[in-house]
Regions:
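Solvent-exposed beta-hairpin/edge-strand motifs
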Residues: 63-110, 164, 202-207
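Hydrophobic helix-coil surface modules that form long, contiguous segments used
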Residues: 174-175, 179, 189-363, 392
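N-terminal, polar/Ser/Thr-rich
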Residues: 17-43, 55, 158
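Acidic/His/Gly-enriched intrinsically disordered linker/tail segments
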Residues: 381, 387-429
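A surface-exposed beta-strand-loop module
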Residues: 51, 86-160, 240-248, 253
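Catalytic Zn2+-binding segment of zinc metalloproteases
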Residues: 369-382
Length: 429
């Protein structure tokens, strides 16, 4: 396998050398957003710095408004889901639709207009007041409003539990092959530019939040760490330490993340926080958080172990984990997947998972920090480069730790499970 990876890395390197003057765009964000948990909505103001590193002059930018994918049954998302009976049943139960609107673009101080893609209401073209030259940058501001849908696919709410993903107006990728503006799909993931995020979330003070990046509110972060450490030390679901909300009715939490491809956040009043630190082989120490429900899957009591073991394993496979924090969040059941990854944080949607399966799903989603977040390939076009390689290494992790494979589960004969890890993996993979 090492020889395969070396060959694969060399091919990528040679390909990059063959590309004259390689470039990629950079998109930096400053977002202020307020959660209304009475009508399940977001009201936001977004400032984008778009840096044109391409050799081309750009007269417009394509944007994704992926929350509009939930708006009606005519979107690419709805059409894809409805292709089978299970999906049709999902849509029939989907009553609380969502959308994004109230956009008001200003580009370098000049009001700008946009056009909705004729085929996809979750894709728009922003017309720049003047062309953006190579090597130049532009400041884009817009307000936005999101009616948060009930949870059905990655983003949404389950009563007053919030999974806020693909939630802000986001420029599509422009690379050497041109624009990659595509609609949101249930089966089919993403392609995003790298950038820095400065996100302030205002919400009722009794919510616990997990998000991409580092929490800048020192008092809030200290309380999360203190509570989480005590809950890990207790090693039990009983007598967990609870979060104490500030006296004010609302709070504003600021998160910063550097050189990432996306930003997601999760908020719930019922989260049990668990926290530890992990020392990597280089001596670097990172924060490890998990957030789970008090009445959820009992196996989350060991979730810190799963995140840490997965992070250590993938650091040995691919190179050291590059970010300052790694987190996992327990979410509601998703009919189509066991979890969904975002930079530094992952949502796990497998409420009935066994010990081995929960460990496998958490490790798989944490593993995407290397493949989806660092390599940042076009997942819509080349899904195997993320999911395929990641699944192989997930199976390797399962074999090493449990002599387990999440496809075959308990069907694996006992004598096979007693074999050494390499032989076990050869037999079941």
């Amino acid at each position: 396998m090492r020889s395969f990876l070396l060959t694969f890395a060399c091919l990528i390197t040679f390909n990059l050398f063959a590309q004259k003057d390689y470039w990629q765009q950079q998109v930096n964000y400053k977002i202020n957003v307020t959660l209304n948990d009475q009508n399940h909505s977001l009201k936001g103001l977004e400032e984008i710095e778009y840096i044109n590193n391409s050799p081309d002059q750009l007269s417009f930018l394509w944007f994704h408004l992926w929350q509009n994918a939930y708006k009606n049954d005519n979107t690419a998302f709805a059409k894809q889901v409805s292709r089978d009976k299970k999906g049709t049943d999902r849509l029939k139960k989907f009553k609380d639709r969502g959308y994004i609107d109230s956009l008001d673009f200003v580009v370098d101080g000049v009001k700008a207009t946009y056009e909705t893609d004729p085929k996809n209401i979750d894709v728009i073209k922003l017309i720049l007041p003047k062309p953006l030259s190579p090597g130049s940058k532009v400041k884009i501001k817009t307000s936005f409003y999101v009616d948060i849908p009930e949870y059905i696919s990655r983003s949404g709410h389950n009563e007053q539990s919030y999974m806020i993903c693909q939630w802000y107006p986001k420029p599509a990728v422009y690379d050497r092959k041109g624009w990659h503006a595509f609609p949101y799909l249930d089966q089919g993931e993403f392609y995003s530019d790298f950038g820095n995020f400065d996100v302030t979330i205002t919400l009722p003070s009794n919510y616990i939040v997990g998000a991409t990046g580092i929490l800048q509110n020192a008092d809030e972060l200290k309380q999360y760490k203190d509570i989480g450490s005590k809950n890990v030390a207790a090693d039990s679901r009983k007598n967990t330490v609870s979060y104490v909300a500030p006296s004010a009715s609302i709070k504003s939490l600021n998160y910063k993340a550097e050189n990432v491809v996306d930003f997601a956040w999760f908020a719930d009043k019922d989260f049990v926080i668990r926290y530890d630190t992990l020392k990597l082989n280089s001596g670097k120490v990172i924060d490890v958080f998990t957030y789970h429900h008090s009445n959820g899957n009992k196996n989350w009591v060991n979730s810190i172990e799963y995140v840490e073991d997965g992070t250590k394993a993938y650091s040995s496979y691919f190179g050291e984990y590059p970010y300052p924090v790694v987190q996992a969040v327990e979410g509601p059941k998703n009919e189509m997947s066991g979890g969904m990854e975002y930079p530094m944080i992952t949502l796990i949607t497998s409420p009935n998972a066994s010990v081995e399966m929960l460990d496998a799903v958490i490790t798989h989603e944490v593993g995407h920090n290397w493949l989806m977040c660092i390599l940042a390939t076009n997942e819509r076009t080349h899904a195997w480069m993320d999911e395929g390689i990641n699944t192989y290494y997930q199976f390797r992790y399962e074999a090493d730790k449990y002599r387990y494979n999440s496809i075959f589960g308990d069907q694996i004969p006992k004598d096979v499970r007693q074999k050494p890890a390499p032989e076990f993996q050869e037999l079941v993979y």
